[in-house]
Regions:
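Short beta-strand scaffold segments in enzyme catalytic cores
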Residues: 30-42
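Gly/Ser-rich catalytic serine loop of serine hydrolases
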Residues: 35-36, 60, 94-96
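Hydrophobic "anchor" residues
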Residues: 46-47
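Short amphipathic alpha-helical face segments that pack within enzyme cores
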Residues: 63, 67, 101-104
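C-terminal binding/interaction regions
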Residues: 1-30, 75-145
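Compact, glycine-rich, soluble single-domain proteins
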Residues: 51-66
Length: 145
């Protein structure tokens, strides 16, 4: 039994994000580590973290949520997430969900991700499902084929 066994999964995930949070300027054009995220693998239950990296040119940006998912994929070849938390200097409170690009990424990565829980309020443990953030998603037809 580990010390983390006494913490709920959201506390474990939040603690994991804190290790990644240390905003820094990589160059005069690029910032990193000012948004952090953790995903829990639906396959193994392991927690994977990521941090954002943003440049002056928007096409180079990588959100923390997608970096966490890519870390999961690199480690276990899996893109199905059970849970997601993203934050800055404090735990999520009163909302805060992944951007549209991240929502779309998770929807396209695996049909099962529509059931992914996204923490919107750490204090109350309030969550929302990804499918509720993208009702009537355009890609449903492809998955049903």
């Amino acid at each position: 039994m580990t010390p983390q066994d006494n913490e709920d999964i959201w506390a474990q995930m939040y603690k994991a994000t804190r290790k990644e949070y240390h905003p820094e300027d990589v160059s005069p054009f690029i910032q990193a580590h000012h948004v952090v995220a953790a995903v829990q693998s639906a396959k193994t239950g392991k927690i994977y973290t990521g941090f954002c990296i943003e440049g002056a040119s928007g096409v180079m940006n990588l959100c923390a949520e997608r970096v966490a998912a890519l870390n999961m994929y690199m480690s276990e070849g899996n893109l199905i997430a059970r849970r997601l938390i993203a934050c800055r200097d404090k735990a999520p409170a009163n909302g805060g969900t992944p951007c549209g690009a991240c929502r779309e990424f998770f929807m396209q990565a695996a049909y099962e991700n529509r059931e992914m829980e996204i923490l919107t309020d750490f204090e109350t443990r309030k969550t929302v499902l990804l499918k509720d953030l993208i009702p009537n998603w355009w890609g449903d037809k492809r998955y049903k084929v």
